[in-house]
Amino acid sequence: MSESNVSWEVVIGLETHVQLGTKSKIFTSASTTFGDDPNTHIDPVVCGLPGTLPVLNKKVLEYAVKAAMALNLNIASHSKFDRKQYFYPDLPKNYQISQFDEPIAEDGWIEVEVAEKGKETYVKKIGIERLHMEEDAGKLVHAGSDQLSGSTHSLVDYNRAGVALAEIVSKPDLRTGREAAEYAAEVRRIMRYLGVSDGNMQEGSLRCDVNISVRPTINDPFGTKVEIKNMNSFSAIQKACEYEIKRQIKAYESGEEVKQETRLWDEGKQLTKSMRSKEGSSDYRYFPDPDLGPIEVSNELKEKWRSELPELPAAKRNRYSTELGLSIYDARVLTDESSMATYFEKVVNEGGAAKSSANWITGDLAAYIKSNRLTFDQLHFQPSELAEMLKMIDTGEISGKIAKEILPELLSKGGSPKQLVQERGLGMIGDPKVIEEIIDQLILKHPNEVESFRSGKKKLLGFFVGQLMKETKGKADPKLANQILNKKLQA
């Protein structure tokens, strides 16, 4: 087959399902605790037994509206719930309560920083079609999984059924797998900052379905849309998109049909595979739920909830760059997790310099956090203590080397760096007379090196600095040591 000259345009949209972090389910008081024994968090409402009526959890509405506001969506003053009819083992009622034609919020956007390897980082505005509330389905556990070792059949766990979801539907504004992954990551970041969801993809708290098609040019009609499921990481989203783009282009260029279907991402084989044909909205036979009244959100309530929104990641990134002088990279890393950003700001407020605070937090502290599976708000080493250590480095009381030496104990136990330095006798030697005496001894001990230095081999200054640090166990003030060494060696 000859190589095609067609420059295909990729069109991607994401449906992001965010489990809202309420203690009880969307229409009942049943618990939402993750990881408990199967089918222990169900009740007559979850199962849709005769005589039961759903009642909307008010916290779900609050979380959904706050999420919508953070995504710049317009909040509907009036919306409703609908029944989505379909038969599947994980749906105990044989219908799902969702929102169809009158969602809680529509027409929003977010800006996403896209960093592709080997390319310059750029910012892209991604439109968001809508956000609607719905209940989650149960979870099928299939034969051969870790949970059903040795089993030859599948079972269903209804603990997840009825958990509150906010489904966020993007507009088809994404053009690469990387853009799709960055968009999903930013949505999760926002949800975590708001505190409406933990966004844990491994536990299913955030799940993304990708809708993807290709067309020859931007002026052509959209191609046949394919939905991809079963991606539990941002890298999986990117890889699934990249594989599917190649698959569809190859099919079109070979004269084959691209079917409208749902496909699964196979992480092991790194490919998508057909799951089922894709249903249209008419197949679900939506109609208003007769057991649930309309949802009214007053202007007063909207303003109250808007006033409670925290500073969001994009605003923080901008502030860190413009006001604190941090690089775009540092600002991006620091704001990835709200607990890291909060820790950083507390250190700066305690007097730590912004750049050095960022370096220590994104370096040594972040590595410790990751290896010990902690968050920054679980650290024993308090922001005020890190600020104290940074000020000791700035004033020359300790060197960076000594700071790294005491850091492991501070991270594991916390405490005053100043006190720890005193207890260990690690304070810097800042007395010029003491340093001069040690340098005089070094000059007497290394006459050949002194002669070579004075003959023009200026690189030997590093040798003497090393010897001085060895003698003082790294405690000599580096700036003062260099000044005195230069003076003595030039004599």
Curated annotation (Swiss-Prot):
Ordered alphabetically, the record's keywords are:
ATP-binding, Ligase, Nucleotide-binding, Protein biosynthesis
Catalytic activity, as annotated = L-glutamyl-tRNA(Gln) + L-glutamine + ATP + H2O = L-glutaminyl-tRNA(Gln) + L-glutamate + ADP + phosphate + H(+); L-aspartyl-tRNA(Asn) + L-glutamine + ATP + H2O = L-asparaginyl-tRNA(Asn) + L-glutamate + ADP + phosphate + 2 H(+)
Q: Which Gene Ontology terms cover its molecular function? A: asparaginyl-tRNA synthase (glutamine-hydrolyzing) activity; ATP binding; glutaminyl-tRNA synthase (glutamine-hydrolyzing) activity
Q: Which PROSITE patterns match?
A: GATB (PS01234)
The UniProt transmembrane annotation reads none
Q: Which InterPro entries match?
A: Asn/Gln-tRNA_amidoTrfase_suB/E, Asn/Gln-tRNA_Trfase_suB/E_cat, Asn/Gln_amidotransferase, Asn/Gln_tRNA_amidoTrase-B-like, GatB, GatB_C_1, GatB_Yqey_C_2, Gln-tRNA_amidoTrfase_suB_CS
Question: Single Gene Ontology BP term?
Answer: translation
Class of this enzyme: ligase
Enzyme Commission no? 6.3.5.-
Which SUPFAM superfamilies does the UniProt record give?
GatB/YqeY motif, Glutamine synthetase/guanido kinase
Q: Does the keyword Glycosyltransferase apply?
A: no
In which domain of life is the source organism classified? Bacteria
Q: How does it assemble?
A: Heterotrimer of A, B and C subunits.
Q: What does this protein do?
A: Allows the formation of correctly charged Asn-tRNA(Asn) or Gln-tRNA(Gln) through the transamidation of misacylated Asp-tRNA(Asn) or Glu-tRNA(Gln) in organisms which lack either or both of asparaginyl-tRNA or glutaminyl-tRNA synthetases. The reaction takes place in the presence of glutamine and ATP through an activated phospho-Asp-tRNA(Asn) or phospho-Glu-tRNA(Gln).
| Family the entry assigns | Belongs to the GatB/GatE family. GatB subfamily.
Q: What protein name is recorded for this chain?
A: Aspartyl/glutamyl-tRNA(Asn/Gln) amidotransferase subunit B
What organism is listed for this UniProt entry? Prochlorococcus marinus (strain NATL2A)
Query: Which gene is the coding source of this polypeptide chain?
Result: gatB
